[in-house]
Design a protein with these regions (language model features):
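Bacterial N-terminal signal peptides that target proteins for export
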Residues: 1-10
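N-terminal signal peptide c-region/cleavage motif recognized by signal peptidases
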Residues: 16-23
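Ankyrin-repeat boundary/"N-cap" motif
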Residues: 27-37, 58-72, 96-113
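Ankyrin repeat structural motif
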Residues: 41-53, 79-89, 111-119
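Alpha-helix initiation and capping sites
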Residues: 80, 93-96
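Short, solvent-exposed mixed-charge patches
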Residues: 123-124
Length: 124
């Protein structure tokens, strides 16, 4: 008597479970590529990847973490001066004005040439 509704429910569940497709991890792949290009200090490939993905550094700066660091800290830690300067130039002055990244860089990588670039951009 209740076989038809049970059959419909079971069929719906089965079809639903097989038809689910996990979302493509394009964002994850973009983040991995950006982190790799920063670590390799490859500014040209970084610019190309950002342009082809139609994103800007200032829009993704807070969202992407590379080895637990933001993009600028990752550049400082990787001694990636070229990509670090590119990141600094594409960030707003207000995002650097708090001095948190400068303090982190001075505390952990005092010899980095990016510290002067960050200070100059932030107006400190």
């Amino acid at each position: 008597m209740f076989k038809l509704p049970k059959l419909v429910i079971v069929t719906a569940i089965a079809v639903g479970s097989f038809s689910y497709v996990a979302p493509a991890n394009a964002e994850d792949q973009l983040a991995v590529s950006i982190c790799e290009y920063i670590a390799a200090d490859d500014k040209n490939r970084l610019r190309s990847k950002l342009k082809s993905s139609r994103v800007k550094i200032r829009n993704i700066y807070d969202a992407i973490q590379c080895n637990g660091n933001n993009l600028l800290r990752h550049a400082v830690a990787s001694n990636a001066v070229g990509t670090g300067e590119y990141i600094v130039k594409n960030l707003s002055k207000s995002s650097l004005a708090d001095g948190v990244d400068i303090a982190w860089a001075e505390g952990n990588h005092a010899g980095s040439p990016l510290i002067a670039v960050i200070k100059d951009r932030a107006g400190l």
